[in-house]
Amino acid sequence: MSDNVIDKLYSIILDRMKTMKEGSYTVELIKRGKHYVAQKVGEESTEAIIASLVESQQRFVEEVSDLIYHLLVLMALENVTPQDVYKELERRMKK
């Protein structure tokens, strides 16, 4: 695992999935299931768009952070790693 924050956060999410730590927001999302998490990704995406259009840059950063977090939870539920995404992005950059 690398030292970047995305990989670290993904590792924490996987740990929460494994331990089902009581009181964890990640665990609450996991318990609600993939459909709920996917809905949260949609909500956070909309909030990020709105923030980019009418709110401060800081608010936009906060909403993008929420979006990335929820995407990582959904990725974990789908058994997709950040490395899978990195590889796909690298493949696309070569085009």
From Swiss-Prot:
| Superkingdom, taxonomy of origin | Archaea
Q: Any idea which UniProt keywords this protein has?
A: Amino-acid biosynthesis, ATP-binding, Cytoplasm, Histidine biosynthesis, Hydrolase, Nucleotide-binding
Q: Which reaction does it catalyse?
A: 1-(5-phospho-beta-D-ribosyl)-ATP + H2O = 1-(5-phospho-beta-D-ribosyl)-5'-AMP + diphosphate + H(+)
Which pathway is it part of? Amino-acid biosynthesis; L-histidine biosynthesis; L-histidine from 5-phospho-alpha-D-ribose 1-diphosphate: step 2/9
What's its EC? 3.6.1.31
Task: Please give the biological process terms from Gene Ontology that the record holds.
Answer: L-histidine biosynthetic process
Identify the CDD domains for this entry: NTP-PPase_HisIE_like
**Bilayer-crossing regions:** none
Annotated localization:
Cytoplasm
Which coarse location class applies to the principal site listed for this UniProt protein?
cytoplasm
Q: Name one GO cellular component term.
A: cytoplasm
Please give one Gene Ontology molecular function term for this protein. phosphoribosyl-ATP diphosphatase activity
Record NCBIfam families: histidine_hisI (TIGR03188)
PANTHER family assigned: HISTIDINE BIOSYNTHESIS BIFUNCTIONAL PROTEIN, HISTIDINE BIOSYNTHESIS BIFUNCTIONAL PROTEIN HIS7
The family note in this entry says: Belongs to the PRA-PH family.
Which protein is depicted? Answer: Phosphoribosyl-ATP pyrophosphatase
- Organism equals Sulfolobus acidocaldarius (strain ATCC 33909 / DSM 639 / JCM 8929 / NBRC 15157 / NCIMB 11770)
